[in-house]
């Protein structure tokens, strides 16, 4: 019943979750980012003609040398498909067929009208604006997921000090290279801000219908998708406005970024630096990059349980080197820690099962006198030391652990494309041959045979309960194999524990509800 409740709740959550830039001509107070009218040749993915390519061990980036825009960023170590031939997942990118685009630009408000290339290295590009006023360098940190942009003013700075900005531009729609399935689309996709008053404030693009802005020092603005994200990380001492803007002037593009304020002339001349993270949402890595950046990993309602569970899972994986085995070992450890609670529930059910024949006799004797039936049943419970709710409440306390495990495994990029054994080659994807859901259904059926039938359950309800293993297995068909593996391990261990407790109370040889 605990699984039924948990799976139904989580299925409901999943159901709910499923259900251009023109150069800036306004003054700072009215600055807005609008789709640029200048035509730029957009090439199909995989083609680099017309773009400059820079790369390091983690990222492969395409930059337009004429505008300085970062048009594409691929993650080399995270492929779209689970094979060696597949290309890396795109964080930034475009799709000519659908019109989808997600890119980044930076510079000075109302300044810059095209660039020329000054120099190129394997991991960087240097540009100068056509009017010679702005110098731009875009580089990749060695062996890292960060893009570093440096915008500098060349020559004398005007009295009206130019305002630096950095922004991401995105049309609404499903993330590039995301698997199109129910479970994949259930994760949060949208904008997130880090502010002094709210460490993690998020909203979906379609909900942005007016200008959103936060005046502050430091912080970050990010666009989050399942497993990966793009985040603009600002210096803690820089005064700025974090913004999100809806489409305007006929554009279909949303904007999220940062506009610097109170920028010193010396800083503009030496170069305003922007950090942009483009990579996987690995908690330990995000913690080291910026305060509260790890909050972009959605650990759900029971995050205080999910976070330590993920830490334990990672520690176990370091020792055994297999995420599937790690899930089984962590499940065993959790069941061991929860044994005192489970034991109370199992002992109560064992006593109920032992008293089953007497209870059935009372029900037959007083079937026409419900008042007397209730009195005699309560007298039997008192005599045998049975608490009718004793078997449910301790197990109910374990539901938060199951839900925490659900979010932990759903959001963990560490499990993406990680194999277990044999047919399971991706723990983040559903079991391709439905073996684990079938095993779970069998274990759930065996567990039902052990559990005493609740008093007063009508025959129709009893028949529905018999088909519950099949219904839960059907739901598990679309769940990640890692989560189903946890459920199988949890059910198997619970079954062993329950049989041991029944043997202790002499209830093993008594007929269960299936025999009745």
Enumerate the predicted regions with their spans:
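Short extracytoplasmic/periplasmic juxtamembrane "stem" segments immediately C-terminal to an N-terminal membrane anchor
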Residues: 28-50
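Soluble non-transmembrane domains of integral membrane proteins
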Residues: 55-295
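Intrinsically disordered, low-complexity segments enriched in polar/charged residues with Gly/Pro
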Residues: 39-41, 48-49, 125-126, 248-250, ...
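Helix-loop-helix
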Residues: 1-35, 63, 151-152, 166-185, ...
